């Protein structure tokens, strides 16, 4: 038998999708699986936070997502990673469980029935909605996006628990997202600049400034991350709040070589992620 690995999702392929499927919101916290009385990350390393271990280590075989704060908050990845990947502290963390890994050959619906919520202790079973057609899936996705989540997870009701990544053809575990996200290594930094060039008005009445470098003034904080993408690089300069821009720039040496999680839309004409936006720093123990 292959060694245990968490089951991971692949992007869904509409042409391969077979109904009915079970659908739920895509959670974007920190993956957690309880094995041998230890809460483990996706990489099967212990979650560092003592409070997390104290609260959830008794939930043997539960597989789910740790969430700090609200599960549909736009900053949930950052707040969750910050809370559960440090040893000390008692973050406002909940465990949203969606699978049970004791018997990997058992059907998903049977494994799901083994899960139990414990609202008093912040343990919640993720509801699964049966979807019977592409029309129903599109309606469910619209509702999920309107509530603030960023995608949908799909499961075959008869799926086993696969050790590793499910394929689109298998359909055991799939994700429906209109954008992509991935982790990229930080290989450089660009400083944010203030454009002191004289403002002029275009023929359309819009204000514009020259991009002449001589009149650009360094602002002493991050303008963009330079990220590795295969044999090339690309820049990501959006998605940061003010504190992150200042902190990352001040501690560039510490962040160099770490991985940034980036949201992006397909690929541009230069074959690099298009319109990238920063989601957070991804702890290597959760990769």
Where are the regions that the model predicts?
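Covalent nucleotidyltransferase
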Residues: 14-124
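Nucleic-acid 5′ end/cap handling module spanning
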Residues: 2-46, 103, 123-272, 276-285
């Amino acid at each position: 038998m292959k060694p245990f690995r968490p089951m991971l999702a692949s992007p869904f392929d509409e042409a391969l999708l077979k109904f009915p499927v079970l659908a739920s919101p895509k959670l974007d916290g920190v993956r957690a699986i309880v094995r041998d009385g230890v809460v483990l990350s996706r990489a099967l390393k212990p979650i560092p936070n003592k409070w997390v271990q104290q609260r959830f280590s008794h939930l043997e075989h539960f597989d789910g997502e740790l969430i700090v704060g609200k599960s549909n908050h736009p900053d949930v990845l950052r707040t969750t990673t910050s809370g559960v990947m440090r040893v000390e502290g008692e973050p406002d963390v909940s465990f949203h469980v969606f699978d049970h890994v004791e018997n990997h050959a058992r059907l998903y619906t049977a494994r799901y029935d083994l899960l139990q919520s414990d609202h008093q202790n912040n343990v919640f079973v993720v509801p699964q909605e049966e979807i019977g057609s592409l029309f129903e899936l599109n309606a469910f996705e619209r509702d999920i996006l309107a509530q603030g989540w960023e995608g949908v997870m799909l499961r075959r009701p008869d799926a086993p628990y696969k050790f590793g990544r499910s394929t689109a053809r298998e359909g055991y575990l799939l994700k429906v997202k209109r954008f992509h996200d991935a982790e990229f290594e930080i290989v450089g930094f660009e400083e944010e600049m203030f454009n002191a060039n004289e403002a002029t008005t275009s023929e359309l009445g819009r204000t514009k400034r020259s991009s002449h470098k001589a009149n650009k003034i360094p602002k002493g904080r991050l303008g963009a991350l330079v990220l590795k993408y295969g044999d090339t690089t690309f820049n990501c300069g959006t998605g940061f709040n003010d504190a992150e821009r200042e902190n990352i720039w001040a501690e560039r040496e510490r962040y160099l070589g770490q991985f940034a999680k980036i949201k992006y839309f397909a690929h541009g004409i230069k074959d690099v992620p298009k319109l990238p936006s920063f989601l957070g720093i991804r702890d290597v123990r959760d990769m």
